[in-house]
Amino acid sequence: EPSLYASLSVTPRLNATLTLNSDFADAVLDARVVNLSRFELFKPERRSFFTQDAGRFGFGGLEVEEPVLVPFFSRRIGLGSSIDGGLKLSGTAGPIDLGAFVVQVPGRSDAPVARMGVARAAIGLGESQRLGMIATQGTPDGLGRIQLAGMDHQFRSTRFMGERTFE
């Protein structure tokens, strides 16, 4: 099937991206790794639809490679099936950094399609603070209706006890 990947600048600082029948054939393959632990491996995202403006979806300053609670990890989307389509809006609107997208994947026999959505907004509070929120809906495999909402506050000072950095 033919696929489509299109990007449009809605404003100079806000972009919309559409993908249909995505096969991500241009994505670099991961090296094979044997995981003998009971914990999931967090490999970096390589698909362009998800890597473009990926920093806008970061939560609480957490790195995806760290085995901690990460509310959104795009590598799970489309693992067991293809992605039928996706729409993403990302950029800044005034002082607010924002990112939102919805992706549709083939579902099960009782639910022919499954959708997953993520929305994230953050605003800087001066030079050293940032306040944000995230909301997700759905599961990457379409097997449930799970919602998550969270808020985060980041504080960073480069003048903590002299010249040390405090986060």
List the predicted regions and their residue ranges.
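Outer-membrane beta-barrel channel domains
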Residues: 2-167
